């Protein structure tokens, strides 16, 4: 299994782009990674879980160097929740933000499970986007860092072959909830090894550490979600999420 870096920075990271809720922390003396139920629960559960993790680690907001969040693509409500909370907490504590590609979180978790020795590999990611579509991407791990081969996109399952292997080279590993949609297309029998991923928190934290080391931090106002799919109107629940996580309210959590 891949290991976290020992670094002087203290980072808080969380992701609510899927049905799971992931929260992680690292600081010079250690790290914590937690995965639990998200989805409709995420908007109410995220801030309490963050505060619980901070308390368990014995950290204050002033001890943090940056806040990372899964920027998407993914579920609308989940992306709004994570982005609003990240911005609110960061502004309240005067911290920068590290936006992390949510599909790359899946790729990093799959890589750690299929190539724990850090060997180079390509990973194709497909996440169920509902409505018969997928959020898909392809990434390349060179043994030290990630590169984007095919950027995240919204597509039909039938469109995956040219996306995943435009050069004829099949990615060595596939991962994501969208793989369940592939048998209906007749593609499943031709696909390479598929990997289940379930430790998003640790994968997110490793990516946050890499982003921090590479100077990927931005001001809170510049940290935006990546949706890929347009949406005309918000549901009542989504409007409630936005109201709950507006900056002043969320910033108050920093002082709690």
How would you name each of these model-derived features?
Residues 53-57, 92, 110, 204-212, ...:
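Stable alpha-helical structural segments in soluble proteins, enriched in small hydrophobic residues
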Residues 192-256:
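Acyltransferase
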């Amino acid at each position: 299994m891949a290991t976290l870096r020992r670094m002087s920075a203290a980072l808080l990271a969380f992701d609510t782009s899927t049905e799971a809720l992931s929260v992680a922390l690292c600081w010079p003396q250690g790290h914590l990674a937690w995965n639990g139920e998200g989805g409709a629960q995420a908007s109410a559960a995220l801030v309490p879980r963050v505060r619980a993790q901070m308390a368990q680690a014995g950290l204050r907001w002033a001890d943090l160097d940056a806040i990372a969040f899964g920027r998407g693509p993914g579920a609308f409500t989940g992306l709004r929740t994570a982005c609003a909370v990240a911005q609110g907490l960061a502004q309240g504590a005067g911290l920068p933000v590290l936006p992390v590609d949510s599909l790359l979180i899946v790729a990093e978790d799959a890589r750690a499970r299929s190539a724990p020795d850090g060997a180079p590999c390509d990973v194709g990611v497909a996440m169920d986007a509902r409505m018969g579509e997928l959020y898909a991407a392809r990434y390349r791990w060179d043994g030290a860092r990630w590169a984007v081969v095919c950027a995240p996109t919204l597509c039909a399952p039938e469109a995956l072959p040219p996306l995943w292997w435009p050069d004829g080279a099949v990615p060595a590993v596939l991962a994501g909830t969208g793989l369940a949609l592939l048998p209906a297309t007749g593609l499943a029998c031709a696909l390479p090894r598929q990997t289940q991923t379930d430790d998003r928190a640790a994968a997110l934290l490793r990516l946050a550490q890499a982003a921090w080391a590479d100077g990927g931090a931005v001001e809170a106002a510049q940290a935006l979600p990546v949706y890929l799919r347009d949406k005309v109107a918000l549901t009542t629940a989504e409007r409630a999420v936005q109201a709950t996580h507006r900056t002043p309210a969320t910033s108050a959590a920093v002082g709690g």
